[in-house]
Regions:
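Active-site anion-handling motifs in enzyme catalytic cores
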Residues: 1-350
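Short, solvent-exposed secondary-structure boundary motifs
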Residues: 91-92, 368, 382
């Protein structure tokens, strides 16, 4: 194994995410915060406690590239990832943050599941990105769109690996879970944006099952008139709420992840931009690889409300993807070439593809996003 430490890099624009309120007076500008000050403060404290107990964070906090350059860092290898750390649009100046490319050190660098979060690199930034990427001994990405970006910039084919939350087994997450305070057997709704597309599913599930609705609040709009809102959940309670749910409705990627991890019947909604360009969507990418594309609302082939999920098949696919991702990580840490293992298929047993007439293609991308083997790719041509 390897000893790991998280560099406490403090990005200024994130300084209010879990900022400790100093009192009701300082929160008075936000009526919602003031009204729910107690539960929100409890949530903040639970996040802090969970971090202290479960994460090995550097003793010093760094707030700039220059501070990191001047520090005498004890690391042998730097690992960057995951999430949208390579998306220039999330930073105030619209540029890449060199820290997330390890530009402060000449030590060996590894990338695990970073995301660009955008369909293409802004004009004039390709050379900068090429310089950053060429400093890595091992590269991987979280979505197929990122794979294409790296190929276009560097000429390299890099693996698409699982989000880190999927590298652990269900039992690992269950061990970290605590009672979420909602009992057992309910419809859990976890929304990080307006629940518009989910609302009809939530109503119908509540009517047909008679189960109560519990809202793990990520937005200020109630998903159901009788929903019980929980604002105080920290990471451990968050896990407990997924563990103890009967159904899950979500528009969050990680809400989808933990529905899969705890094997809960679920429906997930994606943003209109993701629906229009599923190749850029981490939710489409994950669920298509697991054979769960029909759990996405609005695609035209959404599963029936009470349709069962073949969790044995999902578990087999997830186990295979997890092994490939862990193999990449081990090779990267040991500085070995990464050669993905593939099950051998005899030529005579491999069926030839049946190609449809291209004039019948509407460009909806449903076949590509729903293929359980992730065997279909689509590219634009002069006809669309």
């Amino acid at each position: 194994g390897s000893e790991c430490e998280i560099i406490d890099y403090y990005v200024n624009q994130d300084n209010t995410l879990f900022q400790r309120p100093t009192g009701l007076g300082s929160a008075a500008h936000d009526a919602h915060t003031a009204l729910h000050y107690g539960p929100l403060k409890a949530r903040y404290e639970r996040f802090e406690a969970f971090s202290r107990e479960n994460l090995n964070i550097s003793g010093r906090r760094y707030q700039s590239l220059e501070e990191l350059r001047q520090a005498e860092l004890p690391y042998d290898v730097l690992l960057s990832g995951s999430d949208q750390i390579w998306n220039p649009k999330i930073f105030p100046d619209g540029r890449f943050d060199p820290v997330f490319f390890g530009a402060f050190s000449h030590k060996r660098k590894i990338a695990y599941a970073p995301s660009f979060g955008i369909p293409r690199i802004p004009d004039g930034m390709e050379e900068e990105l090429r310089t950053y990427l060429e400093s890595f001994s091992h590269l991987s990405v979280r979505e197929r769109q990122g794979q294409g970006i790296v190929r276009d910039i560097t000429g390299k084919d890099v693996p698409v690996v699982l989000d880190p939350t999927l590298l652990l087994e269900r039992t690992d997450w269950a061990a970290a879970a605590r009672d979420g305070g909602a009992g057992r057997g309910y419809i859990l709704c976890y929304c990080i944006s307006r629940p518009d597309a989910l609302a009809p599913y939530i109503r119908r599930l509540a009517e047909e099952t008679g189960l109560p609705v519990v809202q793990l609040c990520g937005v200020r709009q109630k998903v159901h008139p009788k929903a019980r809102c929980i604002l105080s959940a920290g990471p451990a309670e968050f896990l407990g709420l997924f563990r103890d749910a009967a159904y899950v409705c979500t528009n969050s990627f990680h809400g989808t992840v933990f529905s899969v991890q705890f094997q809960k019947p679920f429906f997930t909604a994606v943003a209109p931009a993701e629906m229009a360009a599923p190749e850029s969507s981490r939710t489409f990418s994950l669920l298509s690889r697991l054979g769960l594309g029909e759990r996405i609302i609005g695609k035209g082939d959404t599963a029936d409300l009470t349709a069962p999920i073949d969790w044995a098949a999902v578990g087999e696919r997830l186990g295979r993807e997890r092994k490939l991702s862990l193999d990449y990580l081990r090779c990267a840490l040991e500085d070995r070439p990464h050669t993905p293992e593939e099950a051998p298929v005899k030529a005579e047993e491999r069926p030839l593809p049946h190609l449809a007439d291209h004039t019948h293609c509407t460009g909806c991308t449903a076949c590509a996003s729903g293929c359980p083997k992730d065997a279909i790719t689509m590219e634009r041509d002069r006809e669309g």
